[in-house]
């Protein structure tokens, strides 16, 4: 469990299903379209999948209300496709209920998560992808001190166009090294 002044980052529990359904009923960006949930039963099944994920996957809980308002997780890279052991590089993913945007919760959660990754898990490098239209995520990456490393044109498709063809999105990559993170404090 990770605590900040206003938040608790903790593993998911079965009781989180209703709160998670609220923000995954209508994902705000296409990269989360595959995570869309339609019913409480689907959300409960999703919570069961998340129960064993306690090291890099956390519910973001608002302390004042006890409500799950989002999630943050990290995906350690493997050294090679043949190896299962993670390297010292992680790609985080964060998602927040739309009612909690613009309140600094994403920044607060990401700062705590980055501290956890760099200090507790010994991570050397964190990189994140975001769509070119997701300006709030780009702003968050920059506020975290991440540098923009590149723009990948028509990089990936998460959804289809109305005619059924893939909708390829432009993706921006941001990154920060542990020494850069430590130097910003």
Describe the residue ranges of each PLM region:
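Soluble sensory domains of the PAS superfamily and closely related sensory modules
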Residues: 51-53
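Acyl-donor (CoA/ACP) binding surface of acyl/acetyltransferases
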Residues: 1-31, 57, 61-185
